[in-house]
Amino acid sequence: MDCLRWLATWLAILGGACLGGCAAPLAVNSVTDIRSSTGSRGIDVYEPKRRTDASVPEFAGDQLVEVRTFQNAGQGEVEMTGAACSLEATGFSATMTSPAKVRVPLYRGQSSTLAVTCQKPGYQKRMITVAPFDSTRQARLASGVNGGIVGAVIVAGIDAAADNTKNDWRYPVAKVVLEADPSGR
């Protein structure tokens, strides 16, 4: 009986430790809009060139990109609020306070990499880049994993024959991990 009690206690401790790292993301209460540097009035930063029939990337809508800041704690990373952040890309920029959601344009196969910089008193300034990924292709290839080797081979063949020019592209979450400033500033 003591062995079962011991086992139950350790399983509870282990389960609590595992679930402790699964904190829900902090709530975001507003959406930040971009500032175009191309003269565009809307989300499509290539719109002024598009009106003149210039060759520009195909506009494919927009996405709310999450910008989140974390600090290294003794047991892992902990999300924090209040960092001053900026986002820059080809044709646009935005400033926000973390956590935030920023509405950014999407261009089929040609979305710009995002440069996200965050700073907060007591932490070192940090910049990361966030590259867009082909979400259509990723979903297609992931579906083959469930079918084993045969499924993966079939999906790889389908992917090779597919017209990927109309695929949807997305950005992942911009996760900026800030390190404590050793100088204490």
Describe the residue ranges of each PLM region:
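Short loop/turn and low-complexity linker motifs enriched in small/turn-promoting residues
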Residues: C22-R185
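Sec-dependent bacterial lipoprotein signal peptides
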Residues: M1-A24
